[in-house]
Amino acid sequence: MNAKHRVTSHCDHELGICGISPEANEALPAKKPLEIYTFIDPLCAQCWSMEPILKKLKVEYGHYFRIRVLLAGKLNVWNACEAGKAKYTRPPVWVKGVSSSNMPYAGDIKLSDFHPYKASLAIKAAELQGPKAGHRFLRKLRETLFLQKQNITNEDVLKACANAAGLDVDAFIADLHSPSAAKALQCDVQTTNEMDVDTVPTFVFFNDNSEEAGIKISGQYPFSIYVQLLEDMLGFVPVKATPPTLEGLLQTYGFLATAEVAMVLDLSSEEAEKKLKTLMLQQKVEAVPYEYGTFWKWLM
């Protein structure tokens, strides 16, 4: 979208993106041509650290793609766990990787009592209520793990996450123990193996209008790399949505880290924090500090 077409910031809750005015919607594709397979592990610190980049990609170019979340677990390990009864054996140092990103977290997390199968199964159960419900649940799940240091493989904690994400909690619990969620998770693992995904996070970009193979990228790269991948898959330079205002962004997402605000709005961390503190003085947001960073809760 060039400068002469800029309009007042708008957030489309159906599209799940900001910066698209009703007038500008006419210039956007009616059907999203791309799909991004996002291979993650809900206990993975590096996956959590990707949130600012993914948020910016959705806000600016979300009208071109859908995101499909796949759980890249180890099926042979889960089978040996008898459907999640065995405990997690990765050392706590695995979670210390969050400190290398700007995403806040509450300190080192002991994973020895975690059951990884249960957390992944819960995400598939949430997705049975729709993709948006699944995305909301995944976000709450990560916040509960990395910010509150709770055991997200505990069923009571999972119920609380489902409630906070606006899910039908009774249906969620029923689905958690149903063959449907287990089958969906098995499909994720099968896809993970078929695509030779051996590390998380990994992203595979597909064009629904092309028979060509997708493009796979593992790990974290500068934002410009992901935009270039979108351009390569689309075959043209994608139109960037009008950037949202700070208040519009917070109103849409409700609870954001300083790093997410800074990334989406192209601000330094210091600039973002200054603007957020101004809103705090106006009693529009509440600062929620953690040991390694701050989140901001929209109050209006």
Swiss-Prot record:
The keyword Iron does not apply. Its main location: cytoplasm. Pfam families: Thioredoxin_5 (PF13743). One of its GO terms (cellular component) is cytoplasm. Keywords: Cytoplasm. It is found in: Cytoplasm. Interacts with Spx. Adapter protein required for efficient degradation of Spx by ClpXP under non-stress conditions. Interaction with Spx stabilizes Spx and exposes the C-terminus of Spx for recognition and proteolysis by ClpXP. This is ClpXP adapter protein SpxH. The gene is spxH.
